[in-house]
Amino acid sequence: MKGTISHRESFLTHIRQQLGKDSSSSASIQRPAWKHQVQWETNGLLSKEELVEQLKMQCQRIHTRVVETTPEEAPSALRSLMTEYGEGSVMTSGDHRFEQYGFYPMFDSLQHEGFAVTSWNAEASREENIRLAEQAAYSVVFSDYTLAESGTIVLSSHQGQGRALHFLPMMYIVCIEKSTVVPRMIQAVSTLNRLVEEGEQAKGAIHFISGPSNSADIEMNLVVGVHGPVRAVYLLIDDE
């Protein structure tokens, strides 16, 4: 049942007048000019190499392994990780960068060896995508940005990448382009905000994921994998 709002404008005009504001509802709102910009200054002068070192140190604290590779060696590096951790089915996001870095021939060879390789399919039902994610041993995705300060990857849900892809498989492998590593959250969200202001269509939910699933009970006993992947590996691709 919908309600009806009566006298809204007169009510808001009265409040504006009492606050000494312009009574016109079309008066523009100006963003404040902050005297201090510590959110930008913190780690803002670090070089890319220094940010990568900070990222690797932070990943040790959040139980996440970082494997560095080149664009040419990225597919073989991923294959080596699967050999090390145990071969199994793979589900990827629908991302053009898998083709850009030459992952598809490696995925084809996995299928010839008898391992299922699927992608989050925008044409399939939600239930079917979730079923495949539940069965996958590996989730392989690309991050949009990575925060060096906290070891956090930033990515969005969209037609080729549902939320369940990041939480249901046991092993979570994130391909990170070195060029997308930023100091901290302010750089990532500011860029996302600017893109929307410039007219880019906003995607679905934005996810901030820091390593594998970590939980702790009241005694602070760490439990890994309760709400998501048991292991996380960041495959850092030097694209610069």
From Swiss-Prot:
It holds the Pfam family LUD_dom. One of its GO terms (biological process) is lactate metabolic process. InterPro entries: FTHF_cligase-like_sf, LUD_dom, LutC, NagB/RpiA_transferase-like. Belongs to the LutC/YkgG family. Is involved in L-lactate degradation and allows cells to grow with lactate as the sole carbon source. This is Lactate utilization protein C.
